[in-house]
Amino acid sequence: MAIEGVLNEGFVTTTADKLINWTRTGSMWPMTFGLACCAVEMMHAGASRYDLDRFGVVFRPSPRQSDVMIVAGTLCNKMAPALRKVYDQMAEPRWVISMGSCANGGGYYHYSYSVVRGCDRIVPVDVYVPGCPPTAEALLYGIMQLQNKIRRTNTIAR
């Protein structure tokens, strides 16, 4: 059924959960936490070729204005407290995308003494984007997977 047929009737019915989740998926504002070479691919995804703005994804410079954090690159032990602090400053509900092999599990530097073996040891991760570095298409797919996850969540407690 097309939307034109629904609007001719004069009303649309839905649940509050679906409406709230629809608005959340259409206006995701990520906080960029670029730590290494994966950040270049993240910038590439935000540029004109892939244009994340068409999905409602607008990069924000402040954690208080964002609801998604994209951790892109190698997370060192010295940077881990800053990552947690920025995550704690984000408003609820908040989601995390781990981008790249280094953010997912330490990557090439897994056995280094100064590298955290996955950002999921510091913050809860919702979507993992594999690759070294992952392509802009992979990040775009990860964002769409996060949108699907948000659509499936129950917003209002039952």
Curated annotation (Swiss-Prot):
Q: Detail the disulphide connectivity of this chain as listed in its UniProt entry.
A: none
- Name the GO cellular-component terms: plasma membrane; respiratory chain complex I
Q: Please give one Gene Ontology molecular function term for this protein.
A: NADH dehydrogenase (ubiquinone) activity
Q: Which GO terms describe its biological process?
A: aerobic respiration; electron transport coupled proton transport
Q: How is the cofactor bound?
A: Binds 1 [4Fe-4S] cluster.
Q: Which UniProt keywords apply?
A: 4Fe-4S, Cell inner membrane, Cell membrane, Iron, Iron-sulfur, Membrane, Metal-binding, NAD, Quinone, Translocase, Transport, Ubiquinone
Cofactor (UniProt): [4Fe-4S] cluster
User: Topology relative to the membrane, per the entry?
Assistant: Peripheral membrane protein
Summarize the subunit comment.
NDH-1 is composed of 14 different subunits. Subunits NuoB, C, D, E, F, and G constitute the peripheral sector of the complex.
Q: Which family does it belong to?
A: Belongs to the complex I 20 kDa subunit family.
Q: What is this protein called?
A: NADH-quinone oxidoreductase subunit B
Q: Which organism is it from?
A: Janthinobacterium sp. (strain Marseille)
| Protein encoded by which gene | nuoB
